Swiss-Prot record:
Family indicated by similarity: Belongs to the class I-like SAM-binding methyltransferase superfamily. MenG/UbiE family.
The EC number(s) this enzyme carries: 2.1.1.163, 2.1.1.201
Binding sites annotated in the UniProt record for S-adenosyl-L-methionine: 73, 94, 122-123
Protein name: Ubiquinone/menaquinone biosynthesis C-methyltransferase UbiE
Keyword Nucleus: no
Taxonomy, superkingdom: Bacteria
Role: Methyltransferase required for the conversion of demethylmenaquinol (DMKH2) to menaquinol (MKH2) and the conversion of 2-polyprenyl-6-methoxy-1,4-benzoquinol (DDMQH2) to 2-polyprenyl-3-methyl-6-methoxy-1,4-benzoquinol (DMQH2).
GO biological processes: aerobic respiration; menaquinone biosynthetic process; methylation; ubiquinone biosynthetic process
Gene that this sequence comes from: ubiE
Keywords for this protein: Menaquinone biosynthesis, Methyltransferase, S-adenosyl-L-methionine, Transferase, Ubiquinone biosynthesis
Enzyme superclass (EC): transferase
Pathway participation: Quinol/quinone metabolism; menaquinone biosynthesis; menaquinol from 1,4-dihydroxy-2-naphthoate: step 2/2; Cofactor biosynthesis; ubiquinone biosynthesis
Any GO molecular function: 2-methoxy-6-polyprenyl-1,4-benzoquinol methyltransferase activity
Amino acid sequence: MNETEKSTHFGYQTVPTDQKTDKVKHVFESVAAKYDLMNDLMSLGIHRWWKDFAITQCRLRTGQRILDLAGGTGDLAKRISPLVGDEGEVVIADINAAMLNVGRRRLLDQGIFRNIQFIQADAEKLPFPNNFFDRIVIGFGLRNVTNQLAALQSMHRVIKPGGFVVILEFSKPTLAPLKAVYDAYSFQLLPRLGKLVAKDEESYRYLVESIRMHPDQEALLSKMTDAGFEDCDYHNLSGGIVAVHRGYKF
């Protein structure tokens, strides 16, 4: 669907474009407290390996300024923080205050605060100067953005020349047998887990549907190119259930 149209998708529903942001906001307000626990249950803990792999693709160095976009609960930021050191900076930006509050408490409890900032921000209109960050990483957040092209263009604007973006996101399984098992697991088990653990079946049904509506590997690659990124590539993880995309700004 063209992102400039007056309607867009919210999971499998078609909704007015100006309503999607609020609907997604309500989902993440509902799931914030149990979000990381549910990630463990939904992925059988494999999300930790996916995130570790994404961070290795960032090639981080001491002193760099990193944007962890849609970084809410701080699960990527806690991996990034020691790699850039006290001379560096990690900015966690998320549109959802509830997710940021969870992340702030969690990182403080773990003693991770010296090089961390939390900012509530819209990915489509990032409130940072041009050429500001050495790297941008966004984990499992892009599919929830209403206008993904606008968000990618905003990322391109604020990243420094020579820097790059790393996008960790659910994608499309590349093996037919895996797809059948994955569909059954996603649509039958995950909403039930959401109901049991987070007391919210509908929000987790949306999260499953949002994965299916997200562009596949090649379509996202094309969208990154349209936003101005160059030398874009991707790695499939777990048979394409997840992909890590990377694009440079020169």
